[in-house]
Amino acid sequence: MNWEEIGNLDFKNDNTAYMMECPNLVFVDDKPVLIYCPQGLDKDVFHYDNIYPNLYKIGETFDQENATITPVSELHQLDYGFDVYATQAFNAPDGRALCISWLGLPDVSYPSDVYEHQGILSLVKELSIKDGKLYQTPVKGIEKLRQSSLPFNKYIKNTSNCYELNLKLEGDTIHELVLFSDKDGNGLSLIFNLVDGEVVVDRSKVGEAFATEYSSVRTAPIAPADTTARIFIDNSVFEIFINDGEMVFSGRVFPRADQTHISILQGDPTGVYYPLLSFTKPN
């Protein structure tokens, strides 16, 4: 493979970040998408809660001779959760645009550090563009990990904390469920406020707290309408795909041994629960 330097990429950068870490250019639905982590980005330019954000811009065309993306969109949040970083995207031989994220932020201490282990990889996600937004959905192959299917009801106890949960949430209603829940309902709180139009993810009551200086709560606006959520849990990881990947919340948690239940505190979500084979252990 031969490389030729054309020049610095022109993507209408605001130049407030001191480092553009892990930049990658991928083509999604024939449009150039730049995904990167601007360390030190001025929050007056783009608000973010994590120590460093993972953002993207979408262009209409890529001028290879002049290394220019034109016209280019505003900055967008790639993931609304706590720990996504250094997302790497690529175009597969079959034409799909795929990406995988690092779940673990630099310069943040995690409970697993004492075991000389930090970070984990996300699910592999397929990318598409709808209405000027980048959608992310788990690749189809993940479904091979499903062991069975069970109707989701108001309480599931003693899970393995390794499962997929597909939910339908009625609009004009507030739904709250708790993953990694103990018997008293303390765990990872997910609130879908489909009256006022807001999603709230709160990890303050699940296991060992960490990175609290960057808050234990994340929020994002959502249309107050019927909503779907596809949730993946794997022991210390959660990935939540809302409305077919329009919005994603991902993060790490370190639950106590008794936090293995799923509780519903408000609303009446319906759906399907799939116990999964472990993502990380050979079958």
Spans of model-derived segments:
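Short glycine-biased active-site loop of nucleotidyltransferases that positions the nucleotide triphosphate
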Residues: 17, 47-48
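Short beta-strand segments and strand-loop junctions that repeat across beta-rich extracellular domains
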Residues: 1-2
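Hydrophobic core segments of beta-strands in well-ordered, beta-rich domains
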Residues: 5-8, 22-26, 31-44, 97-103, ...
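Beta-propeller blade termini and top-face loops
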Residues: 46-47, 58
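A generic structural signal for short coil/turn motifs at secondary-structure boundaries
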Residues: 43-46, 250
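Short loop/turn motifs that cap or connect beta-strands within the blades
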Residues: 8-12, 75-77
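Short glycine-/Asp-/Thr-/Trp-enriched loop segments that recur within the blades
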Residues: 14-20, 80-83
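Beta-rich accessory regions
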Residues: 52-283
